[in-house]
């Protein structure tokens, strides 16, 4: 057997369906697009949300709310993620980014009380939930808002 004699396994490769190549192919003339109309034309499609001229849902529903331009989004760190640091470490936002616990600092770091903390740490962050602050202090550590 030589390289030019290699053949793909039977049924492993599907033949591309060529449309508009004569009536005998079963896909000639209209090429599977049916008769006239918008979807039969080249480039003919309706935009997402178009309902055939009926007032679309996104226009029937009232406008609501606004986007606060001063909104702050905090990167979230849970207590169980802080266990990866050594006992007595001072955990800062820079250390969290460097160690890969947080990918993007965003508007700051917020520590939440999910999971349990096993180590005594000094944690510096922009915000703390009440349960997180309580858990850090209970282990003999300290929390500091920066």
From Swiss-Prot:
The keyword RNA-binding applies. This is Large ribosomal subunit protein uL15. The keyword Disulfide bond does not apply. Residues 1-56 are annotated as: Disordered. It comes from the Bacteria. The gene is rplO. Part of the 50S ribosomal subunit. It comes from Staphylococcus epidermidis (strain ATCC 12228 / FDA PCI 1200). Binds to the 23S rRNA. Belongs to the universal ribosomal protein uL15 family. PANTHER family: 50S RIBOSOMAL PROTEIN L15, LARGE RIBOSOMAL SUBUNIT PROTEIN UL15M. NCBIfam families: rplO_bact. Residues 23-35 have a biased composition (Gly residues). Keywords: Ribonucleoprotein, Ribosomal protein, RNA-binding, rRNA-binding. GO terms for molecular function: rRNA binding; structural constituent of ribosome. SUPFAM superfamilies: Ribosomal proteins L15p and L18e. One of its GO terms (biological process) is translation. InterPro entries: Ribosomal_uL15, Ribosomal_uL15/eL18, Ribosomal_uL15/eL18_sf, Ribosomal_uL15_bac-type, Ribosomal_uL15_CS. Transmembrane segments: none annotated. Pfam families: Ribosomal_L27A (PF00828). The lineage of its organism: Bacteria, Bacillati, Bacillota, Bacilli, Bacillales. Residues 1-13 have a biased composition (Basic and acidic residues). One of its GO terms (cellular component) is cytosolic large ribosomal subunit.
């Amino acid at each position: 057997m030589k390289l030019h004699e290699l053949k793909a396994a039977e049924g492993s490769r599907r033949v591309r369906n060529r449309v508009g190549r004569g009536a005998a192919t079963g896909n000639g003339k209209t090429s599977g697009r049916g008769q006239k109309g918008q979807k039969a034309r080249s480039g003919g499609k309706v935009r997402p949300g178009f309902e055939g001229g009926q007032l679309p849902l996104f226009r029937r529903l009232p406008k609501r709310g606004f986007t606060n331009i001063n909104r702050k989004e905090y990167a979230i760190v849970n207590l169980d993620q802080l266990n990866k640091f050594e006992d007595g470490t001072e955990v800062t936002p820079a250390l969290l980014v460097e160690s890969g616990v947080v990918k993007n600092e965003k508007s700051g770091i917020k520590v939440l009380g999910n999971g349990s903390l096993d180590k005594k740490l000094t944690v510096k962050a922009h915000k703390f939930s009440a349960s997180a602050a309580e858990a850090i202090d209970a282990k003999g550590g300290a929390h500091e808002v920066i």
